[in-house]
């Protein structure tokens, strides 16, 4: 293909020179649709990481491959790797432990509880932008060091699992006892397009408002950092001010003060930072590097560029006298020295012990010693009052520190894995932890097909409406987040705080529905969980609504959900799952929302792992079924609500209707008859986007066709069933789907 110049005209436009041009739009040549219409709704996130980019094939089962792996052999190879220093990137102190810990930490540390995105679960550190973030400088070397191990074991261990395991083995190889390890993180094969911030430059910080209020859903203080600036806020070496940043960013990663102190102190017991010289001598990141660099970035012209001359960031700090051995030296140095501000050889602000003795080893010259040094953010653990109490307790009680770090490290590296049902391997801890959102195991015989049919009949005869049943089932299941695998219908946490009190769930109406379903369950001859009844009720209502529309449909039902208790539910941890907006229910909350309603719809659809067509058919179906929050009539484009027709699409695309903004209510539109101007419908931005956005309109047209009534119902039922079962990892693991399914 001929290379186009940067000022080339739009693809396909006449060319004065008559030269042939490549018909495929490339990023560097010519403009893309996004360049011409930057404000257009982007639904491309719904179609990423599909089978089209997966080289493993549709039949590949990573869980099966991992469980066939000789994990101890991998661990043995990783132990050997730790001290096998390579000339092209020599190991500090003869041990790669510190580097591997940093790699694992930074893989997991992108996790943010606000939307569950980031984290170690998909191996995204291999791809841009994470592979080229300033805070991830030289972690490309860590992954290259791991390549022989990955190459040896191939598809039996993912990069995502291997990076976390390498961090664990690094800790174990340096004398620390970890809490455990679970495999099960499947790799993805293309970068995830996430919102990492509004800035257009590395280390920019346009993400604040008011009194340093960090905007949601972000979890780091600057573009390209994992957490905080180690030199202090915007380079201001103030440990107390830095503590505020630390607390906020770690909180957004679901860590409390004790876990935060344990992680910082535990991680900084090992290894060092690298600021040997002028950072301007460091070359481009991996994504910006030359072809011949083969994906390695940050090539430095300072000295040898590695080893004693390595430059990763700015500070040059070693925290411990034994940087390759677990100890309490971090706290000993922190509390038993007074600190004075200084600069690293790279010019970064850091701290050194006043009148300190040279007791810290040099990473490459055993004859040399250094004075103890600390980062501004390390001193926060001493000078912030709350952190100081915890730090001093850890200093005086090393066993408490070790236990706290082991638990916090496990949480850090497993927080985005979801329920224990996803955990694989012989090193999974036996102890159940509250942050894992535990659900009791099945303790009773499950209902069969006849039972399910009988229960459906009782539910439909209970007086509960189609709207009641569909809304409740959707509210329960749609809390699922494919990002960190949390939420979903299993556990029936919709009956517990905080979900039972969320505005979007209409608490008073919800309580009435749940009470009736619980009564039906108690009066039935067999034990059945409320979680199963909620889903079964939604299924029954949809099947009836479809039948009323003249279409027979059966939604597969797989029993086995259980009911969690309030004691098994961390209220604060579940609070971020509350929808600020839910376009499927035409709900826009009163809380601050940084997205337009239609953008929030796509965001939620992506968390639900829906495709564009699935999102489209669900919105259209839920509207006519009356699932809107508070019974809103916006988008209910039908004369027969409660009947599963394709009326939403037919009436939205009807050219006899014209649309205009409604007076007095932002984001609401009136659909009026073109001839008489009589009001026919009202709709929101979410409703009208399916007629305005060209791709969504194309999907909508499919369901508005005269002969598509049956297709609409079948597609809606399939998408509905998908959402109801997104969290059924227990079924996926045991392979019981077909065996237990009620058709």
Curated annotation (Swiss-Prot):
Lineage top rank: taxon: Bacteria
PTMs per UniProt: Formation of the three residue Trp-Tyr-Met cross-link is important for the catalase, but not the peroxidase activity of the enzyme.
GO BP term, pick one: cellular response to hydrogen peroxide
Region named Disordered: 1-22
Assigned protein family: Belongs to the peroxidase family. Peroxidase/catalase subfamily.
Molecular function as annotated in GO: catalase activity; heme binding; metal ion binding
EC numbers, comma separated: 1.11.1.21
UniProtKB keywords: Heme, Hydrogen peroxide, Iron, Metal-binding, Oxidoreductase, Peroxidase
Comment on bound cofactor: Binds 1 heme b (iron(II)-protoporphyrin IX) group per dimer.
Subunit description: Homodimer or homotetramer.
Entry-linked InterPro entries: Catalase_peroxidase, Haem_peroxidase, Haem_peroxidase_sf, Peroxidases_AS, Peroxidases_heam-ligand_BS
Active site: 106
Tryptophyl-tyrosyl-methioninium (Tyr-Met) (with W-105) cross-link site: 227-253
Site entry (Transition state stabilizer), positions: 102
Taxonomic lineage: Bacteria, Pseudomonadati, Acidobacteriota, Terriglobia, Bryobacterales
Cross-link (Tryptophyl-tyrosyl-methioninium (Trp-Tyr) (with M-253)): 105-227
Known role: Bifunctional enzyme with both catalase and broad-spectrum peroxidase activity.
Cofactor: heme b
Binding positions (heme b): 268
Catalytic activity reported: H2O2 + AH2 = A + 2 H2O; 2 H2O2 = O2 + 2 H2O
GO cellular component: cytosol
Record protein name field: Catalase-peroxidase
């Amino acid at each position: 293909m001929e290379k186009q110049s940067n000022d080339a005209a739009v693809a396909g436009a006449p060319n004065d020179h008559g030269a042939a041009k490549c018909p495929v739009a490339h990023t560097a040549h010519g403009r893309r649709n996004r360049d011409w219409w930057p404000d257009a709704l982007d639904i491309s996130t719904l179609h990423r990481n599909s089978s089209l980019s997966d080289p493993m094939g549709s039949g590949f089962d990573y869980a099966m491959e991992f469980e066939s792996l000789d994990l101890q052999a991998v661990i043995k190879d990783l132990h050997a790797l730790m001290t096998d220093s390579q000339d092209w990137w020599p190991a500090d102190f003869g041990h790669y432990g510190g580097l591997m810990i940093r790699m694992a930490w930074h893989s997991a540390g992108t996790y943010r509880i606000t939307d569950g995105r980031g984290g170690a679960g998909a191996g995204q550190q291999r791809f841009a932008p994470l592979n080229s973030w300033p805070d991830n400088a030289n972690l490309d070397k860590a992954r290259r060091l791991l390549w022989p191990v990955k190459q040896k074991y191939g598809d039996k261990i993912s990069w995502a699992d291997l990076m976390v395991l390498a961090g664990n083995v690094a800790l174990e190889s340096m004398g620390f006892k970890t809490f455990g390890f679970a495999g099960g993180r499947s790799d993805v094969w293309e970068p995830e397009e996430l919102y990492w911030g509004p800035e257009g430059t590395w280390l920019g910080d346009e993400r604040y408002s008011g009194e340093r209020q960090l905007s949601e859903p972000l979890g780091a203080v600057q573009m390209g950092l994992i957490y905080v600036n180690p030199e202090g806020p915007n380079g201001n070496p103030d440990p107390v001010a830095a503590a505020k940043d630390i607390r906020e960013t770690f909180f957004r990663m679901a860590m409390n003060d004790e876990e935060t102190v344990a992680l910082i102190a535990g991680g900084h017991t090992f290894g060092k930072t690298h600021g040997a010289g002028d950072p301007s001598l460091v070359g481009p990141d991996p994504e910006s590097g030359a072809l011949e660099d083969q994906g390695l970035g940050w090539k430095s012209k300072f000295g040898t560029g590695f080893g004693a001359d390595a430059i990763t960031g700015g500070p040059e700090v070693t925290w411990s006298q034994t940087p390759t051995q677990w100890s309490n030296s971090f706290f000993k140095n922190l509390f038993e020295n007074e600190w004075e501000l200084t600069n690293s050889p790279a010019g970064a602000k850091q701290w050194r012990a006043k009148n300190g003795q040279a007791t810290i080893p040099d990473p490459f010259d055993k004859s040399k010693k250094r004075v103890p040094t600390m980062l501004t953010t390390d001193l926060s653990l001493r000078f912030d009052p709350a952190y100081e109490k915890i730090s001093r307790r850890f200093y005086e009680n090393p066993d408490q520190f070790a236990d706290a770090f082991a638990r916090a490290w496990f949480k850090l590296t497993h927080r985005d894995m979801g329920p224990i049902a996803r955990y694989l391997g012989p090193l999974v801890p036996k102890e159940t932890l509250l942050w894992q959102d535990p659900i009791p195991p099945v303790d009773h015989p499950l209902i069969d097909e006849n039972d399910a049919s009988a229960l459906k009949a009782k539910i439909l005869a209970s007086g509960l409406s189609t709207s009641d049943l569909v809304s409740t089932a959707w509210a329960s299941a749609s809390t699922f987040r494919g990002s960190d695998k949390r939420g979903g219908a299993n556990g029936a946490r919709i009956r517990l705080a905080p979900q039972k009190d969320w505005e979007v769930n209409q608490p008073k109406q919800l309580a009435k529905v749940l009470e009736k379903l619980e009564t039906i369950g108690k009066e039935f001859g067999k034990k059945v969980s409320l979680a199963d009844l909620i889903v079964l009720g939604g299924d029954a209502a949809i099947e009836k609504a479809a039948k009323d529309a003249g279409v027979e449909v059966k939604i597969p039902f797989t029993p086995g959900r259980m009911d969690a208790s309030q004691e098994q539910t961390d209220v604060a941890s579940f609070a971020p799952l509350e929808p600020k907006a839910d376009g499927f229910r035409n709900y826009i909350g009163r809380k601050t929302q940084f997205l337009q309603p239609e953008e929030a719809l796509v965001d939620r659809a992506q968390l639900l792992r829906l495709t564009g067509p699935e999102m489209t058919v669900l919105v259209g179906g839920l509207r006519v079924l009356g699932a809107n929050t508070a019974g809103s009539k916006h988008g209910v484009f039908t004369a027969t609500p409660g009947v599963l027709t394709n009326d939403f699409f037919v009436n939205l695309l009807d050219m006899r209707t014209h649309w205009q903004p409604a007076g007095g209510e932002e984001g609401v539109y009136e659909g009026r008859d073109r001839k008489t101007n009589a009001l026919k419908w009202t709709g929101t931005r979410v409703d009208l986007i399916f007629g305005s956005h060209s791709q969504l309109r194309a999907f909508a047209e499919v369901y508005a066709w005269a002969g598509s009534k049956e297709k609409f119902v079948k597609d809606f039922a399939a998408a509905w069933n998908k959402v109801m079962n997104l969290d059924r990892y227990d079924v996926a693991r045991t392979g019981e789907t077909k065996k237990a399914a009620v058709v």
